[in-house]
Amino acid sequence: TVIDHLFRSLQANRFLEALEETVDVARATGQRAEAYHLKAAGEKNWPKMAQAIAMVDAARAEGLDVSANMYAYTAGATGLTAALPPWVQAGGHDAMVARLKDPAIRARVLAEMRDPDVAWENLRLLAGSDERLILIEFHDPALKPLTGRTLAEVARERGTSGEETVLDLIVEDDSRVGA
């Protein structure tokens, strides 16, 4: 049995390609294949779910033993770091925070966070609005009162953009900040 867990980078804009690869592995090996956590993250990707189900149905009609399981809920949880480019996270948390404190790197990160056409999947943009991002976990006691608030609310109160607020909270809390 081949089990393919569709991890964060393959649960949104590229999830159809990931599912196609799972089907291709089943076809090439003759083994049973299951796509775990099949989901279309991001409102713009929701219409693609019908195509994903059709892909599984077509594979089964072809005689392949292919299946998928899906999340049974309409929300997810991650960290605000899921809104950052992968390169800024390289080397671990401490290296990332050091980069986010560098004004030149911070400017580059902000530009990439605002670009809907970057190659990486920005889960903040996929959410569709900072009103949909609820802050759920802080380590710093001074930030804990923000728990349960939306990113949009906190950004408005601080007078900063959503992107700047993401970076500020990650640095201030010295954590990924649950959202």
What are these regions (language model features)?
Residues T1-L6:
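Extended, charged catalytic domains and RNA/DNA-binding interfaces, predominantly
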Residues F7-R32, Y36-A179:
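Active-site neighborhoods of metal-dependent hydrolases
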